[in-house]
A protein has these predicted regions:
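Residue-identity detector for threonine
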Residues: 36, 46, 55, 59-62, ...
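Charged, alpha-helix-enriched surfaces in structured cytosolic catalytic cores
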Residues: 2-7, 25-33, 55-67, 71, ...
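AAA+ ATPase "lid" subdomain C-terminal helix
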Residues: 40-47, 62, 66-84, 95-101
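C-terminal engagement/docking regions of AAA+ P-loop ATPases
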Residues: 77-134
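Generic serine detector
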Residues: 14, 43, 57-61, 67, ...
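Conserved C-terminal "switch" segment of AAA+ ATPases
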Residues: 1-52, 78-82, 120-130
Length: 134
């Protein structure tokens, strides 16, 4: 779990330097949340193993997690105050998960309602994802 988070963090930081993004380093917590969401949706079960969830058709690879975080950093740098927040990550997250507008949307909405909404400290990400999923 933490190995994937570290890979995403390292790649995002090196890409940010290469692109000279005028943004702060992405908060580790945002990277951790994206990696957790991808992992849970890939495996069809929550991290604690307590709940089975529908899996979308998308691959949700580590490379896609890097892309979602990079997109969030770019939004924060160019349209925000340089600090990446949940709202900066939400559209990339939804775009990565929902490839098929019917099947994937059902899996995503179920994940939002049953997992993300109930998770402690994830209300900001839940709200942002709900907004862009409409």
């Amino acid at each position: 779990a933490d190995e994937e988070v570290e890979i995403v963090q390292r790649r995002v930081e090196s890409l940010g330097r290469a692109l000279q993004l005028p943004a702060e380093k992405p908060p580790l917590e945002e990277i951790r949340r994206v990696v957790t969401i991808f992992r849970e949706l890939r495996s069809g079960v929550t991290a604690d193993g307590k709940m089975k969830i529908k899996t979308p058709s998308s691959t949700l690879s580590t490379a896609e997690a890097i892309s979602v975080i990079n997109q969030g950093l770019s939004l924060a740098a160019h349209f925000g105050d340089g600090r990446m927040r949940a709202s900066d990550v939400a559209s990339g997250l939804v775009g990565a998960v929902v490839k098929d507008p019917v099947q994937d949307r059902v899996a995503w909405l179920e994940y939002l309602a049953t997992v993300m909404k109930e998770r402690s400290g994830w209300k900001d990400l839940y709200r942002s994802c709900r907004e862009v999923t409409q």
